[in-house]
Amino acid sequence: MGAPLSTARRGMGQNLSVPNPLGFFPDHQLDPLFRANSSSPDWDFNTNKDNWPMANKVGVGGFGPGFTPPHGGLLGWSPQAQGILTTSPPDPPPASTNRRSGRKPTPVSPPLRDTHPQAMQWNSTQFHQALLDPRVRGLYFPAGGSSSETQNPAPTIASLTSSIFSKTGDPAMNMENITSGLLRPLLVLQAVCFLLTKILTIPQSLDSWWTSLNFLGVPPGCPGQNSQSPISNHLPTSCPPTCPGYRWMCLRRFIIFLFILLLCLIFLLVLLDYQGMLPVCPLLPGSTTTSTGPCKTCTTLAQGTSMFPSCCCTKPSDGNCTCIPIPSSWAFGKYLWEWASARFSWLSLLVQFVQWCVGLSPTVWLLVIWMIWYWGPNLCSILSPFIPLLPIFCYLWASI
């Protein structure tokens, strides 16, 4: 008992006739006496290993009639349970020797613009011209096609297009055009809604400015709140329908809308007159009437095949016609100025005054700067409601 356990068991392990009846602890894998679970957990590498070869070679009837213990005992059929050390597979050969007989490395593909230039940008004309090349046609026709197509690479465009679309389908649609086609209406709708909301605030802003003229120095208030049906204090620009001042508010809004409509009409007339789309006959000096008709001395008739008459004719009492060319621009403006000058003689003095102001340009500019500096804040508060109309006017000016 005092001797080391390993020494006593080593002698016992040399006796190959000692059987292992029930298969417990085969090859001493779980025997704690041989320090299998302490210093050397893996029994395959334990120096005190004592194999029992006869335990792995159990014959029929070796342990009694009709009784054969399970091979490997309680640990199963694995090689480790049988005390056999399994080795890992050998390392593969290096890549230098493997590539001599194995798969070759994939070469670098050339860029798409060199191999398929027709695929860079869809163009029907260039695409059909590129199909005349046999190398390009090989991408769309099967390899086993007829030899006549290869020998005659210039078939009709209709048959070629139909054959291509029957195999490959319709060409891919340009997503950039689709995106721009969808976003453009949305952006226009957003701009229209924004301008509409701003335009609807113009009558309210002008109404506030209009009513503020009646309450100089005092906060504005609706006078209808002191009537027999008392209403809570409110501004004259936000009267409820039950307030007596509601009808006056609606009247002011209606007048403001008419004023805005008149302003838009004046802008449209100015735009058409600038484009030369108002062929108005000018007045002769000293005359107040004009009449259009066929001209005897002009090269183009007043009512000919041209879109607009290029000259106007006045018919005095003697029967002779006097032809006057219509200005290509500002014809209506010149007509109004001549008509006003014929009736108001003092306007001629205004022309001289304007010319004098133009001659004194530094002084005029300083005067304008001073006026803007002095009245600028008030003008900005008055003109700020009309700022949303400016983009509309600019768009109409550029489109017509």
Curated annotation (Swiss-Prot):
Its main location: virion. One of its GO terms (biological process) is caveolin-mediated endocytosis of virus by host cell. The keyword tRNA-binding does not apply. Residues 2-181, 275-348, 399-400 are virion surface. Residues 120-174 are annotated as: Pre-S2. It comes from the Viruses. The keyword Glycoprotein applies. A lipid is attached at G2 (N-myristoyl glycine). The large envelope protein is synthesized with the pre-S region at the cytosolic side of the endoplasmic reticulum and, hence will be within the virion after budding. Therefore the pre-S region is not N-glycosylated. Later a post-translational translocation of N-terminal pre-S and TM1 domains occur in about 50% of proteins at the virion surface. These molecules change their topology by an unknown mechanism, resulting in exposure of pre-S region at virion surface. Residues 2-253, 203-253, 370-375 are intravirion. One of its GO terms (cellular component) is membrane. The large envelope protein exists in two topological conformations, one which is termed 'external' or Le-HBsAg and the other 'internal' or Li-HBsAg. In its external conformation the protein attaches the virus to cell receptors and thereby initiating infection. This interaction determines the species specificity and liver tropism. This attachment induces virion internalization predominantly through caveolin-mediated endocytosis. The large envelope protein also assures fusion between virion membrane and endosomal membrane. Isoform M is N-terminally acetylated by host at a ratio of 90%, and N-glycosylated by host at the pre-S2 region. Myristoylated. Coiled coil: none annotated. Systematic vaccination of individuals at risk of exposure to the virus has been the main method of controlling the morbidity and mortality associated with hepatitis B. The first hepatitis B vaccine was manufactured by the purification and inactivation of HBsAg obtained from the plasma of chronic hepatitis B virus carriers. The vaccine is now produced by recombinant DNA techniques and expression of the S isoform in yeast cells. The pre-S region do not seem to induce strong enough antigenic response. It is found in: Virion membrane. Residues 70-115 are annotated as: Disordered. Keywords: Acetylation, Caveolin-mediated endocytosis of virus by host, Fusion of virus membrane with host endosomal membrane, Fusion of virus membrane with host membrane, Glycoprotein, Host-virus interaction, Lipoprotein, Membrane, Myristate, Transmembrane, Transmembrane helix, Viral attachment to host cell, Viral envelope protein, Viral penetration into host cytoplasm, Virion, Virus endocytosis by host, Virus entry into host cell. This is Large envelope protein. Belongs to the orthohepadnavirus major surface antigen family. InterPro entries: HBV_HBSAG (IPR000349).
